Every structure is written in structure tokens, then in C-alpha cells.
Amino acid sequence: MNLQIVREWMPTASQHFLIGALAVLCYVITTRLRGERRAATAAIAWVMGLALVPYITLPMYLLFGRRKLRPPGLVRQHLAPGTQLWAADLLDGMGLAPASPSHVRWQHDGAAAQAALWQLIEQAEHRIDVCTFILGNDPLGQGTVERLAHSARQGVVVRVLLDGFGALLLPRSHLRRLRQAGVEVAIFRPFFSLRGNGPRNLRNHRKLLVVDDRWLWSGGRNLAAEYFTGKAGEAPWRDISFTLDDGTARAAAEQFAHDWATVQRQLPRDLLAPVDTQGTETALTQFLPSGPDQPEDTAHALLLGACFQAKRR
């Protein structure tokens, strides 16, 4: 009896073909309407799954298939024509801020990174903008929270942007302590919220701290002990971070203002007036944002461009 019921519910070959064709058509239409571009392997995998197993693949595609968000775009200054630098021209075509001279200081170990991070927080005079995927419930995270709260109590405007997935295990006491001190806290795409659109797997992994729109601390480290000092007798993870100032820091501040305005559904704020620090630059740097809010796969495109431009190896 059960086998007979299953057979009655199973589609015929023609019905399966029709459902598969409609699923593939749905993929083509949504991809065209959104203007999305995928790697050939990813596109082939989606089409094969939709054609062969549409009953499972189509719901997965509708839930997780979207690659990009569509927040309001950033207005960037474009380079003068004829730069003859392929990388600069490529990034300018993507609408990214141009390269600028900066004073760069690298931190190759966690102790140096922690010292640089906390020094920047303590030297802030006007504002601090923080974006991180993880804010740890550990001495490093608690120390960062205390310093941010202290700066806010001293009259510094402090804003903290956390990712909704990375903040799932964050104790509410951290957020309460920050808000009680006057720190503004926002969550990028809260995991269990119905607000907004797009799949929940599109996250904000940016890790940066901008002080007075002039100094930037960034790199691969989240604000958690395992990235700096280690925890539970374990050595810290090997990672790298840096601080720099001037033009690239302003580009990072502009990106944070855009991210914050998107989450809060408001207009981005105006940046502070730039400070002339001529003569302290040590390198030419460029802010290269990537993620679901960028219309292009910026880092991937730059790596491919470098491969095509290679002359010797």
C-alpha cells in the first residue's frame, strides 16, 4: 500500500522534465534581473542541480542562491585618464577609491596588534568606528569593550557595527555596557530577523577600526583572544594586521559610513575635514573592499588581472 502511494505521488518523466525546465528558467530569469555573474563551475552546478533534482535544489537556490546585496552605491572620485597602471584602472572602473600615500605600520604578532589597537582607541579625539565579525567574550573582547565605553564617556562618538551571525554568541552584557556608556551599536543582518531581503548566508566579514576618519587599524584579526593572545593555554592564531593613516583611512571611514547607513536606513554622515600630514608617508596604499555589497568580486578580479598581466612568472 505504501509503495502504491509513493508511485501515485511520483511525477512522470514528462512532469519531471517540465518541473526541471521551469526551475532552470527561474534561475535564468532571476540571474538576469539581478545582473549576477557567477564562476562557470558554480553556474553549471546550479543548472545541473535544478535540472536533475529541482524539488530540492530550487528551494535551496531561492534561499541561498543570491550572491550580492543591493545597498545604495558609494560615490567615488575617479582617477584622471591615462594612468597607464592596469591595476589602478581596473579598480577605478569598479568605482573604488584611488590609491594614496600612507604611513603603514605592520603588526606580525598578537601582542603588537593588541597594543596598536588599544593605542588608537585611547588617542581618539572625535570619533571611533568599529566593524568586526566576532567580538569575543574573553579578556581581549572585554578590554576592547571597556576602552570603547570609556572613550564614549569622554565625549568621543563611538559606533560599533557587528555581524548578525558573528554576534549570535555575544553576551548581551557586552552590548548593554556599550549602550549604557553612549556607544551606538548596530547589527548587520540579524540572523533571526525578518527585516531586509536576501539570503542569511551573506555576511559582513570586515574587520576595521577607524579613528577620527584619519587612522585605520585593520587586517585579518577579529576582536577575540584567539587572534591576539591565545586562550585556554593555546597559542594565538597566526594572522596579520596593520595601522595606517591619511587617504586610505578616509576611504575605510567612508565605507563604514556607507555600511552603517545601510543597516540604519539613513544617509551616510559627512567625514571630518582631512588633516595635512605631508612628509610622513611610507607607502602607496589603496582600500579594497569586497563582500556581498560590492557589485564586483573585487579581490578575485584583481588576482585574475594580475595573472593575465604577468610577464615572467
Language model features with spans:
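Phosphate-/nucleic-acid-contacting segments
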Residues: 313
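N-terminal localization/anchoring segments of enzymes in phospholipid and broader phosphate metabolism
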Residues: 1-305, 309
